[in-house]
Amino acid sequence: KADKSVLEQKRPGLNHVGVTEGKKPASVTAYNNEMAKIHDELEAAKTEADRVIHDDNATPAQVTAAIAKIDAVQPKLDNAISLLHDKENNSELVEAKRQLDEAIAEQDPTPGMTQATADNYRAKKAEAERISSEAQGVINNGDATAEEIRDEKAKVEEALTQLTEAKNALKADKSVLEQKRPGLNH
């Protein structure tokens, strides 16, 4: 009777699958493509191993052949699974964007301010809106790298600083007051 212990030890490895939840979309695609390529070979190895394991009259040559099929496909399966990569943590970017969006949503503070300081504030606000939209794109991109997320967070924080500084730099337009009270200027 053929010794099937090695075959029985190796057979469960063919059932390994990659967990795609929380993985970068591009890595999931690579994994799926690789799994599709090896599908037939993998299924054939499983079928052959199961057949030989359950065949009481299997010969040593059949056991050896089944093991060879497993040994041929197992590294390909392991490689496919290794292609999966976790998504990067973007929670700090999400929080920075929330703070920026809060500042953008504030009531317009420019009425009654000098033209130059109001224009500066509006320009910084438009830039902040552009950066916020760009940040949302990075947040939505499951394939974003840690570096891309970090760089975008820095841009968001800079936009918030610029917007806050522009708000603090707003100056009341005194000429409006002077036009309304001409008698006091004499």
Walk through the language-model features, giving the residues of each.
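Beta-rich interaction/scaffold domains
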Residues: K1-H186
